[in-house]
Amino acid sequence: MGRARKPPPALHRHCEGCFNRHCHVPVEPSVSCLVISCHLLCGATFHMCKESEHTLLCPLEQVPCLNSEYGCPLSMARHKLAKHLQVCPASVVCCSMEWIRWPNVDSETFLHENIMKETPSEECLDTALALQDQKVLFRSLKMVELFPETRDATEEEPDMNGDTSWEETGGAVGGVDARLAPNSCLPATSRQMMELSQEERDALAKTKEGMDLDKFGKWESMFSKEHAASVLTGSLGKSEDKNGDVAGKEQCSSNVRIGDAEGSAERRGPQESQKSQELPATMEMTGLAPWQDGVLERLKTAVDAKDYNMYLVHNGRMLIHFGQMPACTPKERDFVYGNLEAQEVKTVYTFKIPVSYCGKRARLGDAMLKCRPSEHKAVDTSDLGISVEDLPKSDLIKTTLQCALERELKGHVISESRSIDGLFMDLATQTYNFEPEQFSSETVLADLLGTAQPGGLHVELHSECVTRRHNKSSSAFTFTCNKFFRRDEFPLHFKNVHTDIQSSLDGWFQHRCPLAYLGCTFVQNHFRPPGQKAKVIYSQELKTFAIKPEVAPELSEKWKSDHLSGRDGKSLNSLTSLPLEVLQYIAGFLDSISLSQLSQVSVLMRNICATLLQERGMVLSQWKKKRYSHGGTSWKVHNQIWQFSSLFSKINSWEFNDVTSMSEHLKTCPFNIVERKTDPIRLTSMCQPQEKARESLVSTFRARPRGRHF
């Protein structure tokens, strides 16, 4: 424990209410003190006894950054804190840009096949981004969720209450985890060690995860009554054992252990006493405290739904704290109607199933169903006379994507049972024959695709925006940027990457041949950064867009031959031979993504880039989950990681590339085959019968023959 801090001295009687800069009250030991000015020259004047208070408000006082707990090591004057937050290395923003990319089921298959036949290029932006999204998609599709019939039956679920050894599941201090041992089965010393003291319970009740102390007192009174009732029940059972009604039986509870005289440890033999020391595998647990194991299961059988819901409302936080409920359960303040009394929900069935046969039931579905002859037929492949091993295997990628797409668009799986009416139901059966017949619960599609299997592009080249009507939380086809940037870098990243490049890949920033649907892979990039010869690429290693400058061939050949030999015989280039001050000056002109790549060249360059981390880099906190022996968990900062972001240089405007027109490519495009029609073809009007003459009142009188006049 640290030393107790001395409380600040009390203000003098006059100084406590004096705010006059020109105070001339004489100095007295218990009345007033000397008037001084701030030693940092901020302009404030005050009594000497108020100097400690002024340090809390002085704008020139050196204070740590507001994000010092998140890794920022800088200290500055208090009036510079607000301006520093814009460039603080610990003020990190995560990009939440989202887009949708659907799988390619039956459209543009020729284009995708021809693209994968060519050598992958980093200048083909839409293809590189689609391949990266495909990798993310394959790592997120779990096979068991799409095909539950293929679950491995021999897989064992992790059970903390099973045969796990207590030594392997130690607590925070290396002891036995109290969650694995029944309270009634432990010795008296173990029970005393496992039970929490009153101070520990008060501390848990005051934490954010627990409830307040007032409700904790109500819980204690309720649990003390339950404890007294269990003691009374045990004493009655002991008196019955003495009368001879019950002999040779032993009752165990979480708080009281009762035995008859014949079963006591003093009268037992050495073998029986040795067996009594062993901990049984299963033992009945009682008690309704939130920290007791199995309390929710006992409540479901002991009380009705109304009392069970009220117990969850009042004791929800402690149940989460002791691991009885998952952490995603809403807290008490999240319940809008938490103060209202819960009511049991009863389902009323208005449709009554008839108990007798009704002949008109067949007319609901098909009127001729009764007249048609019926026969027994197999619904499987047994009538084909082919064994299951000889049947062709299903395409793993296409079948998985098709089933995931059906669940995404239709809201249900392909094979789903559908009820016709109150009596009949269509039981759908859809099975697939994959190469691996069974999958574990954690198997994803990417785990089944080995290096020997040829890859392909199975998603669309163009992406779509996420709308409000799309359920992106459960969608497997929604992708997120998830890149971290400093607060001053995020607007530039969003404008240059997402607004200028990614949203314009389909026809504006990048233009494909109009005959791409036939399989033509020709593509043009229309824009480049202004003032320099560079091109936009997509780096698969960094998983982001970048600007790559174009180096002249004569400069690249000169760089290969321009090497110096060091004292130890190692080859050194001309850049390494420069002084450290010059190297640091040159590195100051590079963008963040260039600094991150330069730091991986050598140890010297890494040390040069490390000097720019506080000015250009960012710090991220690496969190680690810590589990305690009493069942509670908390997240602690495990490490601080310094790195550069993936932001490239700021681009305010773009310039057109010097590329030829697309019409020039169409002249030599191998898919632009002119089809000349030489045979005469009837027009549409010639294929129909000629229309009748238009009938009118005038034509009617003209067609009437003229009679004789008398």
From Swiss-Prot:
Its main location: cytoplasm. One of its GO terms (biological process) is muscle cell differentiation. Signal peptide: none annotated. Residues 152-174, 234-279 are annotated as: Disordered. Residues 238-248 have a biased composition (Basic and acidic residues). This is F-box only protein 40. Expressed only in heart and skeletal muscle. Residues 572-626 form the F-box domain. PROSITE patterns: FBOX (PS50181), ZF_TRAF (PS50145). A zinc finger (TRAF-type) spans 53-114. Probable substrate-recognition component of the SCF (SKP1-CUL1-F-box protein)-type E3 ubiquitin ligase complex that may function in myogenesis. Directly interacts with SKP1 and CUL1. It comes from Mus musculus. One of its GO terms (cellular component) is cytoplasm. Keywords: Cytoplasm, Metal-binding, Ubl conjugation pathway, Zinc, Zinc-finger. GO terms for molecular function: ubiquitin protein ligase activity; zinc ion binding. It is found in: Cytoplasm.
